[in-house]
Every structure is written in C-alpha cells, then in structure tokens.
Amino acid sequence: FTYVTSPLNVPTIIEKNQGIFEKTFGDMGIEVDYAELTSGADQTQALASGDVQVLYAVGGTSVILSAANGADIKVLNMYSRSPKAFCMYSKDESLTTPESLRGKTIAGPTGTNLHELLVSYLATAGMTIDDVNYVNMSIPDAKAGLDGGSVDVALVAGATAYNAGQQGYHLVADGEGL
C-alpha cells in the first residue's frame, strides 16, 4: 500500500493510524506494509515495477497516464474529489485569465491533478501547455520558485496552497468548474 501524508488524504491517515487495512487483510493472512510515496507519478511507477500492489489516495490523472503507457491498473474505489484544493497561485494580481498566462513560467508536477488543472484552464481559452513556459517540479519546489521569483505561477495543493493564500498570494484559478 502507498501512504500519502498530505492533509488532502485524511482517509488514508485515519486508515493507517487505526490499522484498518492491517486488521482486515490480516484476517485473510495478507500482510500490509506501507511505502510513503507523495506523488502520483511515484506511486504509479512503484505499482508498475511491483514494489507496491495497492495505491491509496492517488490522483486520477496519474492513473490515466500510467494506464495509457501500458500499466495494468484496476480502479477499485474512489473516496473524494476536491477541486478547490488544487490551485494556481501567483504574486502577480494581473494574472486573471488563461490568456494572461501566455509566455509566463508556470511550475508544478507533471502528470498530476495539478498538471491537469493547468491544461484544462488553458483549454478554456483555446490555449495549450505550449503557450506557457511549463517547468516540471515538485509542489514544494514550485512554491519556493514562486517565493524566490523564478516562476510566475506555482501549481500547489493541500497545506502548500493554504499557506500561499495565507501569505497573500493571488489565486489565479483552482479546479472548481473545470
């Protein structure tokens, strides 16, 4: 099983802390071990390589991309959808439309719900990822790039998104309605 600690994954945290899977699967003679993997790309790679057998709290985008690349993945269940938890933040308050992002440097993790958010947002204006300078990096690195001024927009989620809002950064868009 994968274990994702992000606050977006409260069911995962409760399940692990209460030992629900250990008890349920243990009753069937199946041992449960956890691998702490925090990105969907890492989770699907671990599944494809056989390092883990179950992904828990993985983003749909990562699963779709992995399956499209030939991974044998079966979706058994979903427990949430939180479009407002996936955000694009900037220091520049003039970035209010997809068109205003043209040529801007936007950083975030490729192959994730955040990447899908950006692509979907740009598509509302007939734009593609090629219309921006997209840089693949982790959520913490994207936020650090925004803090330091090396990126114009950071794709963030969970506590990092909350903190960006608390710092007064401008919410360009979230996943609501996309």
Where is each model-derived feature located?
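Periplasmic-binding protein-like
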Residues: 79-90, 170-178
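Short beta-strand and adjacent tight-turn residues that come in two discontinuous sequence segments
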Residues: 4, 57-58, 76-78, 108, ...
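Alpha-to-beta junction loops
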Residues: 48-58, 70-73, 104-105, 147-156, ...
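Extracytoplasmic/secreted envelope proteins and their assembly/folding machinery
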Residues: 9, 18, 44, 48, ...
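Pocket-lining segment of extracytoplasmic ligand-binding domains
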Residues: 61, 134-135, 140-178
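Flexible hinge/capping segments at coil-to-helix
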Residues: 90-105
